[in-house]
Amino acid sequence: MYKKILIILIIIIIVIISLIYLKNFILYQPHKDHPVKYCKFFHKLSKLTEPENIHHLYLKTPDNILLDTIVIRNTDTNKCIIYFHGNAGNIAMRYNIIKFLFNYASVIVFDYRSFGRSTGSFITMNQQDLSTDAETIWNYVIKNLHYNPNNISLFGESLGCSVAINLAVNISKNFDSKYYPHSLILNSPFYSLSEMVKSIFHKANLSQFGSVLSNLFREYQSDKLIPFMNQHTKIIIAHSHNDEIIPFEQGFKLYQLIANTHTNSKFIIINGSHNNPGLPDEYIYTLADLFNDW
């Protein structure tokens, strides 16, 4: 009897140690530069607007990381959208969403450190690193591109939602109440990373195991940040019942928390899977209204 318990404990300890080591391999799945795919990506971008409206550059963070960044200017508007992608791939895989967002405003896209052509290593990467990346982009958009903060929308997908939320809250904390992004659009967010881990293990009937492991994933606690969000920033959350990566309940639970304290918020049910969400008419019309009200 005691021997079996000892074996189980040893297995649990091994799993926990393995997860500590492998955590970043699970959480971050960057794709590096693929010349052919990047060539096709830039060729597609060139069809959106004139060449002089597309600017490709590398922005240096305070800790000397170079972030691969693209600015696609929409000359019909003085608004812009900063796009925060999810935990996998790189910006060359995001043409469709860039094309969609370009209908409404100029679009700034970038790869986090270690993703795509950006420098750095994901092995030691953490939430603070991505926060630094996001703030570097924000500062460039404000100081170099000269966009008014109230004319900037933050658009996040998956893990990028948490990065966008963190940036919006940091802006709210560090500046006066008149300095805030116009809107925050979150596609498939999670309530918190630890809650998501618990949810996954609960569905596998391993709730106690999930409770222990959730303590290893204490980053990206969006639920703790939301109360500090500027009340003037409009928030839209969209999630699909068919999302196989981040459960629908995660996004809806986050919306419920936001709606309790934030009047400028809306939840939209979308279709499709996590990486191929279907955007219904309600979503498209809501974004059109959001940007037209700017």
Swiss-Prot record:
Subcellular location: Membrane
UniProt KW keywords: Glycoprotein, Membrane, Transmembrane, Transmembrane helix
Keyword Signal among UniProt keywords: no
UniProt-annotated glycosylation sites, renumbered to this chain: N151, N170, N205, N271
InterPro entries in alphabetical order: AB_hydrolase_fold, Hydrolase_4
A GO cellular-component term linked to this record: membrane
Protein's recorded name: Uncharacterized protein R595
